[in-house]
Amino acid sequence: MVKSQNITWHDSEVTKNERQEKNGHKSVVLWFTGLSGSGKSTISVALEKALFERGVRSYRLDGDNIRHGLNNNLGFSPEDRKENIRRIGEVSKLLSDAGLITLTAFISPYREDRDHVREILEDGEFVEVYTKASVAACEERDPKQLYKKVRAGEIKNFTGIDAPYEAPEDPEIIVDTEENSVEEAVEQIIQYLEDQKVI
């Protein structure tokens, strides 16, 4: 629900197409989704570096980082998770309008919320990247010791354990992080971007 009234959208004199032309690549949002520990942040960090080294203008939005500032007033209830993704979707749209390739690393457990972000972007701009890994594999990795805390009863409503995760039905990219290395995942995504003539 929009609460703001008496507001006007101010158009820029620089178009998205002009920005893309200047940058030498198209703008897309690479939306990494998957369980905690599935590799979203690890792969997006490596991909951001690889794109930077190729001269591609990109920016990474990470779930934990965003909750330190923009979304520090949100918890992990279903309503707060929904608002978290709504805000990130709007920020991603702004970065896309700026002509950047945006990398987002968010569990984003609800399909409906990811679909909403797809809808607010232009056709072809939302690229869903499913970092596929089983709960068992993620729990074995447990880079933040979150699964350990869940099992000890210290964390409730944890995605994949006692809160749902709705896996993508038809993502543009599936990265099986149980079978592929970070380097292989980065190569796979860059190949997709080249094949789609984004870069």
Swiss-Prot record:
This protein's UniProt keywords: ATP-binding, Kinase, Nucleotide-binding, Phosphoprotein, Transferase
A single Pfam family it belongs to is APS_kinase
CDD domains recorded: APSK
**Gene designation per UniProt:** cysC
Q: In which pathway does it act?
A: Sulfur metabolism; hydrogen sulfide biosynthesis; sulfite from sulfate: step 2/3
Q: What is this protein called?
A: Adenylyl-sulfate kinase
Instruction: Give a short account of what the protein does.
Output: Catalyzes the synthesis of activated sulfate.
Write out the similarity annotation: Belongs to the APS kinase family.
Give the positions the UniProt entry annotates as the active site.
Answer: 108 (phosphoserine intermediate)
Q: HAMAP family from the entry? A: Adenylyl_sulf_kinase
EC numbers on record: 2.7.1.25
What molecular functions are annotated in GO for this chain?
adenylylsulfate kinase activity; ATP binding
Which domain of life does the UniProt lineage start with? Bacteria
Catalyzed reaction equations: adenosine 5'-phosphosulfate + ATP = 3'-phosphoadenylyl sulfate + ADP + H(+)
Q: Where does ATP bind?
A: 34-41
Biological process (GO) annotations?
hydrogen sulfide biosynthetic process; sulfate assimilation
